[in-house]
């Protein structure tokens, strides 16, 4: 997994460097984009056990590449008849988006592509109640709060389209692979903020964004 992480980070750096040095032609105004996810708040209306708030900031390098930083917060509650689990924390993803549409089609307004991300989650997990039954009866206990850091990589295909001038909507599918859970192989967190199910190596997800675009340089 460490080799995979090193390779993934190298790929992101190479992609950014290549984009920064290859801007021979720009057919539209490069933009800074600020976005807020609405899927998390809407999902919270239906399920009060999961609150997810996140957004992203992206900066165009050229007509088909953009650097992206995503940040967010998540609070998760899980209850069963014999235990309760709580997890909350902040997460960040860094990476690059690649627009597969040609500049004449995208015009800085449309996106259909894929992103590469490296994610970090700093979270606090605890089990305030735990009950175990054995031959002599039931035993209750708890696991105190513990702060951990998890690492993961991600592919994020998605689409975006402009509704009004400099205002867009779009969705992103999250295909995540856990590199390090932060808790060791024998004790896994049920839910990792920004990643998902901490007991699985692969965790999918989805976001739906409202995006505000700000042109920052005139087209050549």
Residue ranges and their predicted role:
Residues 20-60, 70, 209-220:
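Short glycine/proline- and aromatic-enriched beta-strand/turn motifs that initiate or cap beta-hairpins
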Residues 36-38, 55-59, 94-98, 116-118, ...:
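Residues on the lipid-exposed face of transmembrane beta-strands in outer-membrane beta-barrel proteins
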Residues 40-43, 78-84, 101, 139-145, ...:
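Extracellular loop and loop/strand-boundary signature of outer-membrane beta-barrel proteins
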Residues 45-47, 78-81, 122-129, 180-184, ...:
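Outer-membrane beta-barrel proteins
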Residues 65, 70-135, 207-214:
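Gram-negative (and chloroplast) outer-membrane scaffold detector with strong preference
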Residues 162-220:
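Predominantly the C-terminal beta-signal and adjacent terminal strand-loop region
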């Amino acid at each position: 997994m460490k080799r995979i992480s090193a390779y993934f980070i190298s790929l992101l750096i190479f992609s950014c460097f290549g984009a920064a040095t290859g801007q021979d032609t720009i057919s539209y105004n490069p933009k800074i984009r600020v976005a807020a996810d609405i899927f998390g708040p809407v999902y919270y209306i239906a399920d009060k056990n999961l609150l997810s708030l996140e957004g992203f900031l992206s900066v165009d390098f050229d007509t088909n590449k953009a650097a992206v930083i995503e940040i967010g917060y998540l609070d998760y509650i899980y209850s069963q008849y014999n235990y309760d689990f709580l997890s909350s924390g902040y997460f960040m993803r860094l990476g690059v988006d690649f627009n597969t549409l040609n500049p004449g089609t995208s015009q800085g307004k449309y996106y259909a592509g894929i992103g590469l991300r490296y994610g970090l989650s700093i979270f606090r997990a605890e089990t305030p109640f735990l009950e175990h039954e054995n031959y002599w009866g039931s035993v209750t206990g708890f696991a105190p709060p513990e702060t951990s850091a998890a690492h993961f990589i991600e592919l994020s295909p998605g689409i975006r389209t402009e509704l009004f001038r400099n205002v867009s909507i779009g969705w992103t599918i999250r295909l995540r692979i856990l590199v390090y859970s932060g808790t060791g192989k024998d004790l896994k967190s049920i839910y990792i903020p920004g990643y998902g199910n901490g007991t699985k190596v692969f965790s999918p997800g989805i976001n739906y964004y409202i995006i505000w675009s700000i042109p920052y340089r005139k087209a050549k």
